[in-house]
């Protein structure tokens, strides 16, 4: 059964609940900087909670924010919005946030991983909400400055005060997301669909599809540069068309030859066997097996990722890609 979602827009959401409240954004990276700036520009009192030795402290001060240690920011805040990487969140939460929480505060997240997989277990006397813009931080900020916004997801995990949903929607509006539209979801659905999408398509599947297409062309004797153009470079053009017009709009924009070849051969390459394989790995996410595996590597995540990236970094497609990007003026 397909779930029906509720979408909220700008004129349906009030920011009144944020009046006289302080939002402490924990972290000043990709999302932290964008969300903090947008909320501040929307009239919300925003402070930053950062490590004193961190490089982002001075940058946040330069950007005009009040910056405190994480502990002090939590003490001063009504809403503690945690925007640091998934694997470091539990330790930071246990040591620097949880001991200073008080009744009626709210914990905010932009990804449900640690709540859904019980790496963070909040006390019962706080609200727990999620506001998850569906774009990188840079675009979240750019679209806000253009007078628009990016779509977002909102969810409530724990509603101690009875106002958690209104709070999440108000924060989404302050970030600019209700200008585009905000979809109500759950921590479970956001977390699992995000991980499944990353692994099957956006990061895992896409890289392997492009890489294997490149390898086939090269193995058949075509120059690597031509292979790169056909398997990788032009993928952006197609994705831009899909992003702007959908599948049908993209197909109407390409040549009839490309259309016929793609529609007749594509389903035979990405066939039901591939779909079944996708379902198998989606179940690893749904069962918690993937999370358990990734969490077990938390202490050595950098080394693990470095090792996993080596074959990609050393692949011929990367060497050729650098050459093509220089030709295109994208790299020096």
From Swiss-Prot:
Residue ranges annotated for the KARI N-terminal Rossmann domain, each copy included = 5-185
**Where is each KARI C-terminal knotted domain found?**
186-331
**PROSITE patterns, per this entry?**
KARI_C, KARI_N
Cofactors named for this entry: Mg(2+)
- Detail which positions bind Mg(2+) 2: 194, 230, 234
Where along the chain is Mg(2+) 1 bound?
194, 198
Q: In which pathway does it act?
A: Amino-acid biosynthesis; L-isoleucine biosynthesis; L-isoleucine from 2-oxobutanoate: step 2/4; Amino-acid biosynthesis; L-valine biosynthesis; L-valine from pyruvate: step 2/4
What are its E.C. numbers? 1.1.1.86
One GO-annotated biological process of the protein: L-valine biosynthetic process
Q: Does the keyword Amino-acid biosynthesis apply?
A: yes
Q: Which GO terms describe its molecular function?
A: ketol-acid reductoisomerase activity; magnesium ion binding; NADP binding
Q: How is the cofactor bound?
A: Binds 2 magnesium ions per subunit.
Q: Does the keyword Amino-acid biosynthesis apply?
A: yes
What reaction(s) does this enzyme catalyze? Answer: (2R)-2,3-dihydroxy-3-methylbutanoate + NADP(+) = (2S)-2-acetolactate + NADPH + H(+); (2R,3R)-2,3-dihydroxy-3-methylpentanoate + NADP(+) = (S)-2-ethyl-2-hydroxy-3-oxobutanoate + NADPH + H(+)
List residues traversing the bilayer: none
- The active site consists of 111
The entry's NADP(+)-binding residues are: 28-31, 51, 56, 86-89, 137
Keywords linked to the UniProt accession: Amino-acid biosynthesis, Branched-chain amino acid biosynthesis, Magnesium, Metal-binding, NADP, Oxidoreductase
Per UniProt, substrate binds at: 255
Q: How far does the signal peptide extend, from start to end residue? A: none
According to its UniProt record, which protein family does this protein belong to? Belongs to the ketol-acid reductoisomerase family.
HAMAP family with a match to the protein in the record: IlvC
Q: What is the role of this chain?
A: Involved in the biosynthesis of branched-chain amino acids (BCAA). Catalyzes an alkyl-migration followed by a ketol-acid reduction of (S)-2-acetolactate (S2AL) to yield (R)-2,3-dihydroxy-isovalerate. In the isomerase reaction, S2AL is rearranged via a Mg-dependent methyl migration to produce 3-hydroxy-3-methyl-2-ketobutyrate (HMKB). In the reductase reaction, this 2-ketoacid undergoes a metal-dependent reduction by NADPH to yield (R)-2,3-dihydroxy-isovalerate.
- Name of the protein in its database record: Ketol-acid reductoisomerase (NADP(+))
Q: Which organism is it from?
A: Pyrococcus abyssi (strain GE5 / Orsay)
Its organism's taxonomic lineage begins at: Archaea, Methanobacteriati, Methanobacteriota, Thermococci, Thermococcales
């Amino acid at each position: 059964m397909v779930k029906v979602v509720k979408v909220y827009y700008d004129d349906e959401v009030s920011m009144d609940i944020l009046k006289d409240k302080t939002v402490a954004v924990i972290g000043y990276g990709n999302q932290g900087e964008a969300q903090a700036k947008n909320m501040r520009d929307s009239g919300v009192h925003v402070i930053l909670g950062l490590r004193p030795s961190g490089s982002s402290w001075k940058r946040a001060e330069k950007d005009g924010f009040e910056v405190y240690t994480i502990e002090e920011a939590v003490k001063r805040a009504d809403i503690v919005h945690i925007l640091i990487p998934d694997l470091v969140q539990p330790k930071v939460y246990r040591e620097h946030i949880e001991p200073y929480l008080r009744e009626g505060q709210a914990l905010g997240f932009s990804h449900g991983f640690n709540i859904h997989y019980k790496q963070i277990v909040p006390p019962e006397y706080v609200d727990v909400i999620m506001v998850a813009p569906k774009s990188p931080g840079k675009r979240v900020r750019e679209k806000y400055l253009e007078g628009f916004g990016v779509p977002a997801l909102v969810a409530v995990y724990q509603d101690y005060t009875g106002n958690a949903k209104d709070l999440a929607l108000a924060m989404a509006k302050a970030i600019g997301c209700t200008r585009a539209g905000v979809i109500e979801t759950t921590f479970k659905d956001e977390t699992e669909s995000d991980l499944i999408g990353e692994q099957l398509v956006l990061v895992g599947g896409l890289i392997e599809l492009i890489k294997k297409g490149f390898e086939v062309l090269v193995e058949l004797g075509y120059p690597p540069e031509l292979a790169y153009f056909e398997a990788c470079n032009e993928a952006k053009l197609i994705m831009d068309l899909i992003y702007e017009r959908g599948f049908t709009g993209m197909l109407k924009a390409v040549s009839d030859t490309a259309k016929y070849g793609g529609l007749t051969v594509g389903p035979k390459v990405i066939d039901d066997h591939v779909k079944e394989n996708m379902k198998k790995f989606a179940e690893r996410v749904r069962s918690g097996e993937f999370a358990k595996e990734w969490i077990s590597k938390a202490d050595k995540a950098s080394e693990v990722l470095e090792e996993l990236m080596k074959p990609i970094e050393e692949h011929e497609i990367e060497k050729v890609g650098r050459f093509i990007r220089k030709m295109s003026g994208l790299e020096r």
